Amino acid sequence: MASSIRRGRGAWTRLLSLLLLAAWEVGSGQLRYSVPEEAKHGTFVGRIAQDLGLELEELVPRLFRVASKRHGDLLEVNLQNGILFVNSRIDREELCGRSAECSIHVEVIVDRPLQVFHVEVEVKDINDNPPIFPMTVKTIRFPESRLLDSRFPLEGASDADIGVNALLSYKLSSSEFFFLDIQANDELSESLSLVLGKSLDREETAEVNLLLVATDGGKPELTGTVQILIKVLDVNDNEPTFAQSVYKVKLLENTANGTLVVKLNASDADEGPNSEIVYSLGSDVSSTIQTKFTIDPISGEIRTKGKLDYEEAKSYEIQVTATDKGTPSMSGHCKISLKLVDINDNTPEVSITSLSLPISENASLGTVIALITVSDRDSGTNGHVTCSLTPHVPFKLVSTFKNYYSLVLDSALDRESVSAYELVVTARDGGSPSLWATTSVSIEVADVNDNAPAFAQPEYTVFVKENNPPGCHIFTVSAWDADAQENALVSYSLVERRVGERALSSYVSVHAESGKVYALQPLDHEEVELLQFQVSARDAGVPPLGSNVTLQVFVLDENDNAPALLAPRAGTAAGAVSELVPWSVGAGHVVAKVRAVDADSGYNAWLSYELQLGTGSARIPFRVGLYTGEISTTRALDEADSPRHRLLVLVKDHGEPALTATATVLVSLVESGQAPKASSRAWVGAAGSEATLVDVNVYLIIAICAVSSLLVLTVLLYTALRCSVPPTEGARAPGKPTLVCSSAVGSWSYSQQRRQRVCSGEDPPKTDLMAFSPSLSQGPDSAEEKQLSESEYVGKPRQPNPDWRYSASLRAGMHSSVHLEEAGILRAGPGGPDQQWPTVSSATPEPEAGEVSPPVGAGVNSNSWTFKYGPGNPKQSGPGELPDKFIIPGSPAIISIRQEPTNSQIDKSDFITFGKKEETKKKKKKKKGNKTQEKKEKGNSTTDNSDQ
């Protein structure tokens, strides 16, 4: 029967093969599907009937079927809807092993007419196989004498999956002695080595337990572990020692034969044969003890050998020796003190049959934790056992049946208060005296994320000095979470916000694990004085809980900014300034005021002023206010004083170390009548670079220079002509010749008494532009000059000719220039013209006398430049007002630059002629003079100009 069946199957197979070969020409096709491995039964693969172009109604009549030689039962077709589905479990690793490609090939056959279709179903790999090590525990023996960097090769894990799912990475648990070294042999394999990083000492560390974890690259990741046990070998240098020298044991007198009296446990710090201990009774033990007790040489257990009788002996003293197997061997000793109890009872027995541990801290009341069974071999009252539990615990015992108890939860748990309970269950019988037995139940409370991370205080104040190095550690925040494990794993982050126009994260960062706060860039006190932000602490629980703490970072100022001198007016540099002071001023006259600012704060911005006196400057008649910066005269000036003074003012802050700046004030002493109503001030930098007159119109300067040059040439020519003509009587007072000093802008007359002081002084600053009308004699025709005394020539300048006018280009230049009064440079008041330099401070009246010690945070008003010619502080013109008169530096004449109405009378006396009209008349009368005298006068004029 079986033979016929096998023959029938063989015939059917051959017939099927012939039909397939015959139908190959009739019709064929190929479809390709994909399905993941481990797909459940009924998983959709594809609409095979639709893809083959077959109608659902003809599937059954045409005998639609699926044939496969090797995997016929894995896939099946639903003839009702023509869907190819998974029929049974598909395991890619079982089908194809580690092959990169895995497919199931089936043939679909239909009759009427006969057609064969080839269908290929690709099985896609999923990460269903974790990495597997050859063994779960690997033991390695290391002698304590092994050198550092000693290597021990390890065998890696294998993963049955392919591709990324089989890409493994390794991680070794932290250890102070060993680390893992991974070297790639080729693209597919890696060699692992355990490297000794710290010397071993077996007496301190006998064993080292490591855990090697292999993780694949799939999602989700699967891991495999191997425990590595490293044993440290040693020599026999330690003797066996018992836990205690005397063991006290009590036994019932009816103890059965073979009852364990005590189990000795001697320890030897050595390893291997050196730590193997053999136990034996002492050599001086009596024969009685040897007949009643026996000791196991390996385990150290002492058991009863014969019947014990309380009436025969109440106690026994047993000497025990422990000897190791080292060479040479070493021994240790102890004594067992055995006392017999004269009680003829059996103690109850307690057993725990089931446990449900650990228990969650949010478990509901009444949760059953353990089932406890008690028993007693006695009968009657002596066998009736009751159980009790350790008091004051959140558990209770509930009796269910006789001798059966349930340990249930009686009150709420809080793992943060108590993380584990060690319960003692006591079983007591009803005998007299009663006997009892106890057992311990360890209950661990599982954590629930019910506590948010907490900071020690809600706000911290941090002080950081400015100019810190980038990335420096400024503070550490620390939050504590009362939960455990992942629920207590706290991570830190910044609560992002904007600080001005920048993000907070551009200033500081916080380490997610340690909570260390770092400054990402140097902080600048002048930019940010207080940086207030929040740090968030969040645990890793589900759902996560978090809290915030506020950090106030105060940026402390450092003395990193030197005092900066303020320019006298906008557009000029700060450094040196020239001042003209009349000889007639008295003590306390304010010459100038030095103003400076310091970008720092506190003592670092508190500025003081002092004069730097050189050699020979003991009689200098000037002083500077310590905190006001006002330069004033200390006494009345006399002829013994030098006509030129170069004052070097040192501006110093109070930082550590102190920073300084210097200002140079050039003071020229002139006659009272010749002192200009407003002095021309030009500033240069501390390095002595030339300052530019940026506030005076360029065209005006060019015009004045051109006119002045023409005037110089005219005066020189006129002087030569005058010297060649014999002077007439009455033109000069006898015995008092007048010296004419020429400059680039004109000439002026001084008496013989003052000519040496003025003409032979130091060179004036190049930016001083002076124009004086010539005070020369006009000959006998001028009756007015004949009546003037010498002092009048010196003290009174000539009035300009009333018919002098500006050229058209010069007037256009003046109208298009910046108004000087609008810039605060020139102003007129009741006390005469004052010169005020623009400052950044508020316009507050200056103190008239005395010095006031500024506060620690001295402001700009006390540290900026202010210069004024004389006392008084007249009101300044308002912005946009055009000054009535313009003062040419160095000239007592005033040029009007205001637009006058057409119907108004122009006062021609307000204009300077520079003697041009007068000289034109005299050119017509000029004669040839002595050439030698002309050269001599030119030489004197040049010398005088250079001295000025």
From Swiss-Prot:
InterPro entries: Cadherin-like_dom, Cadherin-like_sf, Cadherin_CBD, Cadherin_CS, Cadherin_N, Protocadherin/Cadherin-CA
Membrane topology of this protein: Single-pass type I membrane protein
One Pfam family, short name: Cadherin_tail
Subcellular location: Cell membrane
Biased composition (Basic and acidic residues): 783-795, 907-921
GO biological process, one term: homophilic cell adhesion via plasma membrane adhesion molecules
Domain of life the protein comes from: Eukaryota
Domain Cadherin: start-end pairs: 30-133, 157-242, 243-350, 351-455, 456-565, 588-678
One CC-aspect GO term: endoplasmic reticulum
Cytoplasmic side: 719-948
Region: Disordered, residue numbers: 754-801, 829-854, 868-948
Record GO terms (molecular function): calcium ion binding
List of glycosylated residues: 257, 265, 362, 548
PANTHER family according to UniProt: CADHERIN-87A, PROTOCADHERIN ALPHA-2
Biological function: Potential calcium-dependent cell-adhesion protein. May be involved in the establishment and maintenance of specific neuronal connections in the brain.
Name this protein carries in UniProt: Protocadherin alpha-2
Organism listed in the record: Homo sapiens (Human)
